[in-house]
């Protein structure tokens, strides 16, 4: 059974077609880049997978289930905009995650915080933007999920923070799960990607292994993307 299957999925906002007859299969054990220009349909696809939107037509299956209560148990989602209460202490947020998610590994979260010399007694609002992003990623990656969906995990942080975030993703990745990373900073993440999905005008225009794309095109993923989308 595939981890994710999208069959003829279409999503409209009024008359605007955000996703157009999307067919997609994702297997376990992959780190996948979901790449496309602004307005291409990336966020819509992510919201559909997370049961935040419902398709107008077609079917989405995650481990054989339609998006809902059961799939939320196995998906760990990092949205582009935070949902955390910055007045909470870090240890309070960790307790919240522990209470809410059966697969949350408290010891992993504290170990990752320790490596950054972050005091769990600190309130989130006292942290820099980069540190807040790291804490949010730590919370997401401390779950033992089967599918991680990260929406712009390295957006708005400095290069050193990006390296830490990518390293955290890799070290907490296991072969029984897959990770979908949506980002516009392709050159920063392409080294960790097993596969890439290019989406344009609501359609999947390419889904290929990273190595195969580099071999066939003779270009980096970032270079190929810029040429195809004229960025």
Where are these regions (language model features)?
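The feature captures the beta-strand-to-loop junction immediately N-terminal to the Walker
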Residues: 35-37
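Helix-to-loop junction immediately C-terminal to a conserved catalytic motif
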Residues: 50
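Conserved ABC transporter NBD signature motif
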Residues: 58-71
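ABC-family P-loop ATPase nucleotide-binding domains
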Residues: 80-135, 143
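Catalytic Walker B motif of ABC-type/P-loop ATPase nucleotide-binding domains
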Residues: 148-152, 157
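ABC ATPase "signature
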Residues: 207-208
């Amino acid at each position: 059974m595939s981890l994710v299957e999208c069959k003829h999925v279409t999503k409209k906002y009024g008359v605007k077609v955000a996703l157009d007859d999307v067919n997609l299969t994702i297997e376990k054990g992959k780190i996948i880049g979901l790449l496309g220009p602004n307005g291409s349909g990336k966020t819509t696809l992510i919201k559909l997978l997370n049961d935040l939107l419902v398709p107008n037509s077609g079917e989405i299956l995650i481990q054989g289930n339609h998006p809902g209560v059961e799939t939320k148990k196995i998906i760990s989602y990092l949205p582009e905009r935070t949902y955390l209460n910055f007045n909470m202490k870090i240890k309070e947020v960790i307790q919240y995650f522990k209470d809410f998610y059966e697969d949350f590994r408290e010891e992993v979260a504290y170990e990752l915080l320790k490596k950054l010399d972050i005091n769990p007694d600190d309130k989130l609002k006292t942290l820099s933007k980069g540190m807040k992003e790291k804490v949010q990623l730590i919370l997401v990656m401390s779950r033992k999920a089967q599918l991680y969906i990260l929406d712009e995990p390295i957006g708005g942080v400095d290069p050193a923070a990006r390296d830490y975030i990518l390293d955290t993703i890799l070290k907490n990745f296991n072969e029984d799960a897959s990770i979908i990373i949506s980002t516009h900073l392709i050159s920063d993440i392409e080294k960790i990607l097993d596969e890439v999905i290019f989406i344009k005008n609501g359609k999947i225009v390419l889904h290929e292994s990273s190595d195969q794309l580099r071999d066939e095109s003779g270009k980096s993923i970032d270079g190929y993307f810029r040429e195809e989308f004229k960025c």
